[in-house]
Swiss-Prot record:
This is tRNA modification GTPase MnmE. Pfam families: MMR_HSR1, MnmE_helical, TrmE_N. It comes from Escherichia coli (strain SMS-3-5 / SECEC). K(+) binds at N226, T245, I247, T250. GTP binds at residues 226-231, 245-251, 270-273, 335-338, 358-360. GO terms for molecular function: GTP binding; GTPase activity; metal ion binding. GO terms for cellular component: cytosol. The gene is mnmE. Transmembrane segments: none annotated. It is found in: Cytoplasm.
Length: 454
């Protein structure tokens, strides 16, 4: 297998459909056109032609599109054959194409990888293709499209350019120490550095919003048996996702629902009631419940309001609170307000949000929805936003750390060499986002998660 091979893959989903598309990219795409079509179509024009087998018989008839490189998606010669979407027809056509020497099936994401390697798009834009396909909401799709069009990359490139200018200024101060003007102490470098840090903080904030849109928030409903956890899952999901009975311990395994609140994706997880297990099946369910709790972004601590008047989680169940991860946010949900007569709504107790509601009737559930949205700091009115991945957030965080360390060197010791090194490392972190400095292993992992024909 060579990167110089001409590759072919189906660009439409598998199965039956009105249209099926095969995409070919590489040096032999021209030969494929002349062999299968009998001619080379006019560049960037739709040509309705028969697709022929080796013996000259017609396999299908459809539209052929020819994009000579470098003016194509991949930067190479690209041929698209758009025929009927029957799997048998597409398979016959694919087999015919693969009889031509030098052609092979594309790896997942290889078309996008070649576009990246040929400078047709940067790494953040390439990732946006997969994010656009996988978008689970309208807002996520719009943000992915913004990233594909270069919104995220433009912000990162602006930071890289600012760091380049700053590094030139610092290097000049180091190389010409005998000049009358002390560049390091006259305040200009500090002012420029503060501007870059402020711009980076703004990009980090937008990237966190983009990560929320892409990754979603994992919320685990936990508590004792029969507290109403499954009823709350159903209320949030808007359907009967979980079985609800008066029998304690009805939920034995983890139940997952994916919902959206004003465009924000939420992964709601209902868990088995936490208690001393009565059998092996329940023990496994409780063990899985704790695994989910430890990986959660937030826990909804479900309390049966008819069993206690306490509102402080440490008073309600100290052993449960003691076992939770130290920094895990908790929302106390006092359920069955329709029975206890408690006033619906949200308050605060010991630094934790407290919400009184009735999962059975749905009263107060909207308060919980708004609380979940606000707790993540999600801005539903965000215009021109972009999607971001965890690796993007990590790169931005590392760049911010290097800039802060560089500032400390500047203010503490006027150490120009150390400041220059921190600026270089910050610039390298930012360049990893767009792929200017990225390891081959990381590129392989990123593109292998794509669809075959992308």
């Amino acid at each position: 297998m060579s990167d110089n091979d001409t590759i072919v893959a189906q660009a439409t989903p598998p199965g039956r459909g009105g249209v099926g598309i095969l995409r070919i990219s590489g040096l032999k795409a021209r030969e494929v056109a002349e062999t299968v079509l009998g001619k080379l179509p006019k560049p960037r024009y739709a040509d309705y032609l028969p697709f022929k087998d080796a013996d000259g018989s017609v396999l299908d008839q459809g539209i052929a599109l020819w994009f000579p490189g470098p003016n194509s998606f991949t930067g190479e010669d690209v041929l698209e054959l758009q025929g009927h979407g029957g799997p048998v027809i597409l398979d016959l056509l694919l087999k015919r194409i693969l009889t031509i020497p030098g052609l092979r099936i594309a790896r997942p994401g290889e078309f996008s990888e070649r576009a990246f390697l040929n400078d047709k798009l940067d790494l953040a834009q390439a990732e946006a293709i997969a994010d656009l396909i996988d978008a689970s909401s309208e807002q996520a799709a719009r943000s992915a499209l913004n990233s594909l069009q270069g919104a995220f990359s433009a912000r990162v490139n602006h930071l890289v350019e600012a760091l380049t200018h700053l590094r030139i200024y610092v290097e000049a101060a180091i190389d010409f120490p005998d000049e009358e003007i002390d560049f390091l102490s006259d305040g200009k470098i500090e002012a420029q550095l503060n501007d870059v840090i402020a711009d980076l903080d703004a990009v980090r904030a937008e990237a966190r919003q983009g990560s929320l849109l892409r990754e979603g928030m994992k919320v685990v409903i936990a508590g004792r048996p029969n507290a109403g956890k499954s009823s709350l899952l159903n209320a949030l999901a808007g359907r009967e996702a979980a079985i609800v009975t008066d029998i304690a311990g009805t939920t034995r395994d983890v139940l997952r629902e994916h919902i959206h609140i004003d465009g924000m994706p939420l992964h709601i997880i209902d868990t088995a009631g936490l208690r001393e297990a009565s059998d092996e099946v329940e023990r496994i369910g409780i063990e899985r419940a704790w695994q989910e709790i430890e990986q959660a972004d937030r826990v909804l601590f479900m309390v049966d309001g008819t069993t206690t008047d306490a509102v402080d989680p440490a008073e309600i169940w100290p052993e449960f609170i003691a076992r939770l991860p130290a920094k895990l946010p908790i929302t106390v949900v006092r359920n069955k307000a329709d029975i206890t007569g408690e006033t619906l709504g949200m308050s605060e107790v010991n630094g934790h949000a407290l919400i009184r509601l009735s999962a059975r009737t749905g009263e107060g559930v909207d308060v919980l929805r708004n609380h979940l949205k606000q707790s993540m700091g999600f801005d539903t009115n965000m215009e021109g936003g972009f999607l971001a991945r965890r690796r993007h957030l990590q790169a931005l965080e590392q760049a911010a750390e290097h800039l802060q360390q560089g500032k400390a060197q500047l203010l503490g010791a006027w150490a120009g060499e150390l400041l220059a090194e921190e600026l270089r490392l910050a610039q390298q972190n930012l360049s990893e986002i767009t792929g200017e400095f990225t390891s081959d292993d990381l590129l392989g992992r990123i593109f292998s998660s794509f669809c075959i024909g992308k």
